[in-house]
Amino acid sequence: MNLSFAKGGLPAPVKNRAWQYCQMAWRGVTSKKALSRLAALSPLLLLGVGQMASATDLLAGGKDDVKATFGADSFVMMCIIIAELIVGVAMYIRTKNLLILLGLVVVIVFTTVGLTFIK
């Protein structure tokens, strides 16, 4: 019974066996036969790239739905503005600071302008 252990805790022959398998796999990939097959198939792979690039846009029909949901005149925009108003008024009542109401106007303008870019 061989109980000699290497540093990692596994027997030395197990580590060597794994390394030998890696070396055999690398030799198989880099052999002249494998490289010649790769050289013969690479032009065929390049011919197929043009066929894969042509496709139909499956999400083109959803563009109108996105505009209706997140556009400038949408229901989501109305909900965002109402939420901003509620939070702004609550913050003003809590702090009694008029600059918060000015900030509320600025935030509403920025969100309105930002959501108009959704085309």
UniProtKB/Swiss-Prot annotation:
Sequence ranges on the Periplasmic membrane side: 1-69
GO CC annotation: extracellular region; plasma membrane
N-acetylthreonine: residues carrying this PTM: T56
One Pfam family of this chain: TraA
Keywords: Acetylation, Cell inner membrane, Cell membrane, Conjugation, Membrane, Plasmid, Secreted, Transmembrane, Transmembrane helix
Oligomer and partners: Monomer. Interacts with itself to form filaments; also interacts with TraQ.
Protein function: Propilin is the precursor of the pilus subunit, pilin, that forms conjugative pili, the filamentous surface appendages required for cell-to-cell contact during the earlier stages of bacterial conjugation, and that retract after contact is established. Mature pilin is assembled with the help of TraQ and TraX.
UniProt name for this protein: Pilin
